[in-house]
Amino acid sequence: MVNVMFSEKEIEYLKSQHIARIATAAVSPDGSVQPDVVPVGFDFDGEYFYVGGMNILKSRKYKNVLKNNKVAIVIDDLKSVDPWDPRGIRMYGTADIVTRQSGYMEQTPHPQADYIRIKPEKKWSWGIDEPVLLSTN
């Protein structure tokens, strides 16, 4: 397993964000594959991403991870619309299911201790260590 290293600015950015998009996929009984991407809340501890949810055990992402542990995750935003200045990090990784008592779902009206834990194995980032587009003014 590859140990992805994040720059200090990437870690600062990741810890400032609250929403990610996770993509999962699994083969259904009829042999078809339907990718699924959803916005999710997350925790990041510097090594792993933790994705929970009020009904995580019934979610498609949870069921997909049980069948196929390969996932993709994107965390992005816009620093500015004018000038256009996007930033973000895209990752491929492997996922498993863990129980943790101190995750972000503990603070919700419906605490849940089960999480999808994602170990990034490959990453791409843009606009974090330096601007994506520089102004021509």
Give residue spans per PLM region.
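Short hydrophobic-aromatic micro-motifs
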Residues: 49-52, 73, 116-118, 125
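Extreme N-terminal tail/first-helix region
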Residues: 1-20, 137
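A structural signal for short, well-ordered beta-strand segments
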Residues: 42, 93-95, 120
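Short beta-strand segments
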Residues: 17-56
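C-terminal edge-of-domain segments
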Residues: 99-137
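Short, structured beta-strand-loop surface elements
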Residues: 32, 56-114
